[in-house]
Amino acid sequence: FAKMLADEYHSFVLTASRESEAQYNQEVSEHKQKLHSKKKSDAAFEEVPVKPSFKVVYIPANTSYAKILWHLEQNEGTGIICETEADTLGNVFKQEWGSYSDMLRKSFHHERLSSSRKGNNEFTEVNAPSLSIALSGTPNQVTGLISSSEDGLFSRFIFYAFKVEQKWKDVSPNANNINLTEH
């Protein structure tokens, strides 16, 4: 239910990002056409369109380390991971490309996140990230997410557990002795 509070805003931001990206792609295409049609003697220089940020409110848990860092950079350091099943994040942590426990620990303290890759001479840095995480799940899903309290991730989460009296609810067709086809 909590995720629904910002769903409409997320849709608005996502739509705006997609529209900005489409407009950018159109401008790039027009820019390329102008360059091809210009004469070599034409000295006028046209600026290349600037690519807009692609912002989202919710960042999916099923995302790689590099992509979450990219989302945070695009969002100016902010993001929300909200999943109804905690094992979505737990399963990602088991993948080589998705182990971002250190990113979550650093984000909790708003410490700088950075990454550098040889390909394309890529450098990404997010100062003072504000990343919120809201998960729901069973105790077994939590143990899949946080296998040990030793790495510090456990202490950065608040857990809320409650007991519910288990009552059997008979959902069979004859449960209430009402024939629904004749009723």
Predicted regions and their residues:
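Phosphate-handling catalytic cores of nucleic-acid transaction enzymes
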Residues: 1-183
